[in-house]
Amino acid sequence: MGCGKSLIQLTVDRFAPLCPMENFWVVTSEKYTDIIKEQLPDLPECNILAEPTARNTAPCIAYACWKIKKQHPQANIVVTPSDALVINTGEFQRVMRNALDFTATNCSIVTIGIKPSRPETGYGYIQAAEQINGTEIYKVDAFKEKPDVETAKEYVAHGSYFWNAGIFVWNVDTITDAIRKFTPDLAAIMDEMSRDFYTAQEADTVERLFPTCEKISIDYAVMEKAESIYTLPAEFGWSDLGSWGSLRTLLPQDEHGLSIIHIS
């Protein structure tokens, strides 16, 4: 973004007031571990979890949560992708604190809903139901797949639909219990893997067992099945930068419709 920092560095920066560096965890492909070490030199090396093969987000998140739970059984966790842009970091941190306060005292899952600024067809949507008294948090009525243009326009006009940012907040017991309930095979693999966490055998065990996990997203594995799911609608200048097209919408364009980032 022309600021001299990578997206993962910006992600860590905006969470820094909420979390000490020793409590950051990064799950990534084995082939990117050296890049993570270079980008985040203050991150403890043991907090970089290397997937031997990509199995989608449910096994990825389960691996991190089972490992965190073994050392921090009362952990309150935020799961976030690192390829998003957030403009208003102060508001982002306020929203995260509210979500963490809620999950610290409730056996519930909170997903951050972004108030839509346009009828976007590239994101999934969260349909909110009733508001929880005394909070900014709403019960989730349904998760919606990426819509066509007309449906997206209806969602925006309705006012109770929000973009699914893929940012989840939960207590470690809440998510491990949910995975155990809805995807018991995945939980069984994590239980077996966890016996060797923090030992010399961990890498070999993960290499052997992780590829046997079903390839499934956390949305299908848990979010669309669990009952205690809530959303916290937010406006902090969020954009998913998973494609060049989404990046282009954030950049000024010249008279030819071209966008340029100057990197010195």
Model feature map: region roles:
Residues 47, 139, 228-230:
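Conserved beta-strand segments of alpha/beta enzyme cores
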Residues 8, 64, 83, 126, ...:
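Residue-level signal for inorganic ion chemistry
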Residues 48, 109-111, 231:
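Conserved beta-strand scaffold positions in the cores of enzyme catalytic domains, especially
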Residues 172-264:
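Left-handed beta-helix
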Residues 28, 80, 147, 170, ...:
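A conserved hydrophobic position in a structured secondary element of the catalytic/binding core
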Residues 25, 77, 160, 167-168, ...:
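A residue-level structural signature of the nucleotidyltransferase/glycosyltransferase Rossmann-like core
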Residues 2-81, 87-97:
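Conserved N-terminal catalytic core of the sugar/cofactor nucleotidyltransferase
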Residues 89-210:
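Conserved core of the sugar-phosphate nucleotidyltransferase
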